[in-house]
Regions:
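C-terminal catalytic "cap/lid" subdomain
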Residues: 1-267
């Protein structure tokens, strides 16, 4: 089984990815798709007069501050547009895809971070009324039931809190939790670069292989959102996933290329 995380950044080619998913499922491979929505949510927030606010933690990780209005915008982008049209693309290719968010059937459950600590202008401060969290439980039985019936789950990066609130979660880390819960052999994280770069944005500085014992040290090379991807890779490996690959989502046959070792392979 392979879990695929499609990044939400500009440049990723969904047609190439969906064509590859269709080809692989026809060969009998079990695939679960998790997708992001960052760029689409940013654009929608700008149109609605509520632009996204990205914040940085004291540890250097960037995330979206999600008040209730931002959560509503994110749901519109992630579930209303990206998830629906990803499923549409796959259905046109003969894949019986089914769209879900982590809220559906309590697929992804986690603790809501009502307040978050950020660094702003060199000083730490607390932001409250935040609707973000971290996935702690996966309804693996639901995903297995769908896979056994021939569906390809396409999951939007939302979860439900223990109190029943919808929460925005990091898609890379959520994909890692899904991969671990289902005993997936591979987690492929598709981005708008060839993989982890030693000197971003120089694409010729691609790091082709990282030993899984040294993956945490590779966060030093990660810039921006790539830091969360490295964290997700670390968590997936700790949960027993055999291999994590950061691969280029802009090219044709991105999944096959990743499976052939193109990108950054961590094992």
């Amino acid at each position: 089984m392979t879990v695929i995380k499609i990044g939400g950044s500009v440049g990723i080619n969904l047609d190439f990815i969906c064509a590859d998913v269709a080809a692989l499922t026809k060969e009998g491979k079990q695939i679960i798709v998790m997708h992001g929505a960052g760029n689409e949510a940013n654009a929608l927030g700008d149109k609605l007069g509520h632009p996204a606010k990205h914040v940085t933690s004291p540890q250097g990780y960037t995330s979206r501050y999600t008040d209730r209005a931002t959560l509503e915008i994110f749901v519109m982008a992630a579930c209303g547009k990206i998830n629906t049209f990803l499923v549409e693309r796959l259905q046109k290719l003969g894949v019986n895809a089914i769209g879900l968010s982590g809220v559906d059937g309590r697929l992804l459950v986690g603790a809501r971070k009502d307040a978050i600590r950020i660094v702003e202008n060199g000083k730490q401060r607390i932001l409250r009324d935040d609707y973000t969290g971290r996935v702690e439980k996966v309804n693996a039985d639901l995903l297995r039931a769908l896979l056994e019936r021939g569906y390809v789950p396409v999951v939007a990066p939302l979860a439900i809190s223990y109190q029943g609130d919808a929460i925005n979660v990091d898609g890379d880390r959520a994909a890692a939790m899904i991969a671990g819960a289902l005993g997936a052999e591979q987690l492929i994280i598709l981005t708008n670069v060839p993989g982890l770069l030693r000197a971003f944005p120089d694409e010729s500085s691609l790091i082709a292989h990282i030993d899984k014992q040294r993956v945490e040290a590779s966060v030093d090379f990660a810039e921006g959102r790539m830091k969360k991807k490295v964290l997700g890779a670390t968590e997936a490996l700790a949960l027993g996933v055999r291999q994590v690959i950061f691969a280029d989502g802009r090219v044709e046959q991105p999944l096959r290329r990743a499976m052939e070792g193109k990108g950054t392979v961590i094992d």
